Design a protein with these regions (language model features):
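Short, conserved beta-strand element in jelly-roll/cupin
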Residues: 78-79, 89-106
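Hydrophobic membrane-insertion alpha-helices, especially the h-region
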Residues: 11-19
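Ligand-binding loop in jelly-roll beta-barrel domains
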Residues: 123-150
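Short acidic-glycine-tyrosine-enriched beta hairpin
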Residues: 109-124
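A short, N-terminal "cap"/entry segment at the start of jelly-roll beta-barrel domains
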Residues: 3-7, 19, 23-78, 84-85, ...
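Short strand-coil-strand connectors
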Residues: 72, 105-109
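Short histidine-centered beta-strand/loop micro-motifs
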Residues: 84-89, 130-131
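Short, surface-exposed coil-to-beta transition loops
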Residues: 90-92, 115, 125-127
């Protein structure tokens, strides 16, 4: 029985050492692979200078939006306007309100927002249907992972 315990201890120790040695190599290889698939370029974007009319229109006549950063893992865009209550079954969304104020659906409740509000919308959560009290509303929208073309489900 002692032989099995000693052998097992040596195998565990060897696996630990192999993991310690291999981990930095694997992390470097994975970081390089990711950087090659989604390179980013340094940029500074004046979001406050972008007005509703400057942003491309979308399939929704009340919403204009523009993608700013796109990677394999997430997108960052700016959006202005309103969209009916909906959810994204596969995409988490984070919005940061730059301009405008009002109330919107978030989950099953109407919530007030104003410039400086950070809105966290887990996938599958109903949101939208904004009532604008001061506008237009302009927000940064981060989508994780990038939202697919069929990942919007409109609700009553």
């Amino acid at each position: 029985m002692r032989y099995n315990t000693t052998t097992l201890s040596l195998v565990i120790a060897a696996a630990f050492v192999a993991g310690v040695v291999a981990s930095p190599i694997a992390q470097h290889a994975l970081a390089d692979a990711h950087a090659e698939s989604a390179p980013l370029a340094p940029a500074m974007i004046d979001l406050m200078a972008m007005k509703h009319a400057d942003l491309p229109t979308t399939g929704n006549r009340e919403m204009n939006a523009k993608g700013l950063v796109v990677t394999d893992n997430a997108t960052i865009g700016i959006q202005s306007g309103n969209v009916a209550k909906h959810n994204h079954p596969k995409t988490d969304e984070i919005q940061y309100i730059l301009e405008g104020s009002g109330a919107m659906w978030l989950g099953g409740e109407r919530k007030d927002f104003k410039p400086g509000t950070l809105i966290v919308i887990p996938k599958g959560t109903a949101h939208g249907g904004t009532i604008v009290t001061s506008g237009p509303v302009k927000a940064i929208a981060i989508k994780i992972p990038p939202q697919g073309p069929t990942d919007t489900v409109f609700m009553n």
